[in-house]
Amino acid sequence: MATDMHKLLGTSEEDDDEEMDMDVKEEDDGDRRNRDKHAASGSSSNDEFMFQQSMQDQVGTPGGGGSRRSRPLEEKERTKLRERHRRAITARILGGLRRHGNYNLRVRADINDVIAALAREAGWVVLPDGTTFPSKSQGTKPTGGSSAVAAGSSASHIASQQTSPPALRVVSSGLRSPVELSSCRMKGVFTPAPSPYDMLPIQSPELVGSVNKAEGLVGCSVDVINSKQILEIPPNLTEQDFSGTPYVPVYVMLPLGVINMKCELADRDGLLKHLRILKSIHVDGVKVDCWWGIVEGHSPQEYNWTGYRQLFQMVRDLNLKIQVLMSFHECGGNVGDDVCIPLPHWVAEIGRTNPDIYFTDREGRRNPECLSWGIDKERILRGRTALEVYFDYMRSFRIELAEFLEDGVISMVEIGLGPCGELRYPSCPIKHGWRYPGVGEFQCYDKYLSKSLRKAAESRGHLFWARGPDNTGSYNSQPQGTGFFCDGGDYDGLYGRFFLKWYSQVLIDHADQILCLAKLVFDSSCIAAKLPDVHWWYRTASHAAELTAGFYNPSNRDGYSAIASTLKKHGATLSFVSGEVQVLNRPDDFSGALGEPEAVAWQVLNAAWDSGTPVARENSLACHDRVGYNKMLESVKFRNDPDRKHLSSFAYSRLVPALMEGHNIVEFERFVKKLHGEAVMNHHHHHHQQV
């Protein structure tokens, strides 16, 4: 089944020091052989790497006339870099198989497993010792060492596929701090999956000498040799043609503060101007948050929709569509938040006397970003349960703005299910000190969720399980530094499986109950739920960051199918927040965090498609350049899909003044046309690099 592939993880970063020590001598001899080979023939990726190492020996040896052999510690570090580079290639191969195939591979598959799986898929027989021969339908078993030759040639063929095209190598200085040094070194080891768009022409020589600017170079491998940067600039590649692909409607997310705290349009004239520009480039519509803290901000069941009515009328007059988000969370404190919109004032008053209405971590820190799911059925909000509060809010929207629903101006209603409107626990709060790529913490220590856990433990007959795990580290821990998330840790023991099943089921039950109410309210209108892209630590066994966020998705279990089935049950669309573009826009070390945004995305999308759930997407970080847009297109347009699967819509984040600038709006218009499946003329720009 396709879901088997969801568990295909890349190999973990297991730096076995003893093994590497044994390899140092052999690989040093290999350096010399490869230097000779590089001088003779030149251009394989392995030769380039060895050539770089020879340069490092020359530059790094004081006096210049000494031995080229580096100190043992440096050789060991070089060996580690080679190993990480090899594992990154393996992870990309696994990612491709996960995306396009259905192969029965073990969790920690290596390249031999990949070759064997491909051979078996092609009808060959592969024995446990690696002996490979055709099946009876293909021919007779070869004799002697021919199978080894076949296996070797297969490996050689796959390795040849990894060989990169010739690239310009530029050496310059300019590192200014150890942090920058580390950042560039890691970029030389791990790069995102190669694509026709993993490149960025260098427009000025200053880029070569500036690490801050070089961090934005896409697809350019940045290696470091004793305070020297080596930039490998891939050759120019033709952009993909998306003409004739299925039409994907494009929505632009409006500014978070488009409606002020008085429920009025903050800048009517400026907004109208921008909406007209969006209409002129054939954007389908806009997406807007309907903030609980604004509409029901002062008193229970007193709703003010005035500003939203004005906004919807303006959008309708321009013949645009609207996607609305029922935002039952606060705004402010998260990445990209530029305004502060708290929960309703009367809710905050209840929280001051009963802070257990908020999610709580093991240290007792409360998070007022949204209400705990433990009070969904607790009648503590001025005589109402949380579910009743959400239902009344949605019903008020349905009554007051019915005309926009009935005439189709509102094309989708997304139901906020947690922090940032996403279905997840607030496991990574910046306000409590979390920083990427920490594993986060479980958020189940308010008295209402604690009561639910106790009840679940009693029903299992193990009352001593009525507690959260005590060996999960802290917000910024890494999996291997904890007893719970490490390989073979407690997460996979009897108690761990019980706790994680309960923790994730609370999330699913919350979604199930609210979506049931939403379907009652909005009836025939399209509803949706948003899922985040929790990609860090995906290539470890435990998937720690996903576990704390409420997705029970370790390497031996599929945590997204049950969620997709719940959405399917209520006819809801799965709106997925895409994280792939972060590889381009952020200097985060994806290799060190063992993150794989594309793999997470494909697992979630396949879970949705397998259940028959429609999929919409939105980007998580702003992007105004062609390289970023092309990367997004790769993740939202499925050109080679035999079933012609496509998104129900794409929401672009977000409408800001920079988007409206001349060159940026031209690039965005190209992006919109490609999402619509229209032909786009390629205008080639010539860039000159001075070395």
Swiss-Prot record:
The active site is at residues 422, 618. Keywords: Carbohydrate metabolism, Cytoplasm, Glycosidase, Hydrolase, Phosphoprotein, Polysaccharide degradation. It holds the Pfam family Glyco_hydro_14. Substrate binds at residues 289, 329, 337, 530, 535, 619-620, 654. One of its GO terms (molecular function) is hydrolase activity, acting on glycosyl bonds. Its main location: cytoplasm. It comes from the Eukaryota. GO terms for biological process: polysaccharide catabolic process; regulation of shoot system development. Residues 1-83, 130-167 are annotated as: Disordered. Residues 12-29 have a biased composition (Acidic residues). One of its GO terms (cellular component) is nucleus. Its EC number is 3.2.1.2. Belongs to the glycosyl hydrolase 14 family. This is Beta-amylase 7. It comes from Arabidopsis thaliana (Mouse-ear cress). The lineage of its organism: Eukaryota, Viridiplantae, Streptophyta, Embryophyta, Tracheophyta. The gene is BAM7.
